[in-house]
């Protein structure tokens, strides 16, 4: 089930897991400390376990051994246990080696249409009554597909960008094929003012601060960069309802975030439509939203 092109990096639950043999605890502890000191790593197919407990040191020898294994098998992408993702030194070291760490953002960018549907449901409003704005300077197939999805259903669709010319073909397609006009503008200050829902694909902090948003607007921060608003709801991630078959795997990969784990199973070079088909096939849907301060309660969207 797991993606063989990705390596999963975990840590030991307890020092007694250092060996499959049943040893006295004192001996297991000695073996563990020795293996930890020399930076040993247990490998089971594409699942690597660092010989380190939850709060133990991941030393230079272990990091070097890990890199050698990743280099040997030409691994460019890894999924890390949640605790390792919180280890700034470990994450920095991985990224310095030009290795990608899956963090859920790839999957998150395929979910704007689901977010749009969920928020309309929570607010108890028609999708055709919502004004949506998309903030993007470097359009991709993914952003363009989202534009098409929104334009067909929302009341007004605004695209705020520094590169208006990049959307000329899409503008013409929407008008010719669907009779839909989309508003493409460079005006960051005024274009978002009446928006109910704003999706930020790649605006940085400086550009975001130029965008005037009303307090009832929901900002969906698809970009990794954290953005703090004085008022209004900001969505930074989602909690998904994962299919049972994947949930059973998550019980085995118990140290891993479920959404990132699910992302890793889908992480291939494929089209927007293919990913959407898989999500529909698996019956994936949004349980709740996550903001800068954790879970966002549904009543916050109605304020």
Please tell me what each predicted stretch does.
Residues 224-303:
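Adenosine-phosphate binding glycine-rich loop
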Residues 100-117:
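A glycine-rich, Thr/Ser-enriched phosphate-binding loop motif common to dinucleotide/cofactor-binding enzymes
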Residues 8-13, 52-55, 80-83, 135-138, ...:
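Structural motif
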Residues 180-246:
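Rossmann-like adenosine-cofactor binding region
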Residues 2, 8-21, 31-92, 295-303:
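Metallocofactor- and cofactor-centric catalytic cores in central/energy metabolism, strongly enriched
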Residues 84-91, 143, 164-171, 206-208, ...:
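Short, charged/polar "capping" segments at the starts of alpha-helices
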Residues 18-25, 88-97, 147-149, 168-177:
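Short, aromatic/basic amphipathic alpha-helical patches
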Residues 122-189:
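Glycine-rich phosphate/diphosphate-binding loop of Rossmann-like nucleotide-binding domains
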């Amino acid at each position: 089930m797991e993606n063989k092109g990705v390596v999963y990096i975990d840590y030991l639950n307890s020092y007694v897991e250092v060996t499959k043999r049943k040893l006295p605890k004192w001996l297991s502890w000695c073996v563990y400390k020795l293996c930890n000191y020399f930076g040993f790593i247990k490998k089971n197919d594409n699942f690597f376990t660092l010989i380190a407990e939850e709060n133990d040191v991941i030393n230079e020898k272990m990091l070097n051994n890990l890199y050698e294994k990743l280099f040997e098998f030409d691994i460019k992408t890894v999924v890390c246990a949640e605790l390792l993702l919180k280890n700034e030194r470990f994450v920095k070291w991985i990224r310095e080696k030009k290795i990608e760490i899956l963090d859920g953002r790839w999957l998150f960018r395929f979910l704007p249409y689901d977010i749009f549907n969920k928020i309309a449901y929570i607010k108890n409003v028609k999708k055709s009554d919502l004004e949506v704005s998309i903030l993007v300077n470097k359009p991709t197939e993914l952003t363009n597909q989202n534009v098409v999805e929104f334009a067909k259903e929302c009341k007004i669709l605004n695209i705020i960008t520094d590169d208006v010319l990049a959307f000329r073909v899409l503008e013409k397609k929407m008008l010719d094929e669907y009779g839909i006009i989309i508003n493409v503008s460079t005006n960051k200050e005024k274009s978002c003012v009446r928006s109910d829902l704003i999706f930020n694909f790649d605006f940085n902090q400086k550009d975001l601060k130029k965008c005037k948003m009303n307090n009832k607007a929901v900002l969906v921060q698809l970009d990794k960069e954290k953005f703090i608003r004085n008022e209004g709801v900001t969505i930074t991630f989602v909690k998904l309802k994962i299919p049972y078959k994947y949930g059973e795997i998550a019980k085995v990969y118990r140290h891993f975030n479920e959404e990132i784990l699910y992302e890793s199973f889908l992480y291939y070079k494929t089209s927007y439509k293919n990913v959407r088909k898989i999500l529909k096939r698996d019956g994936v849907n949004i349980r709740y939203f996550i903001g800068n301060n954790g879970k966002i309660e549904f009543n916050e969207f109605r304020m």
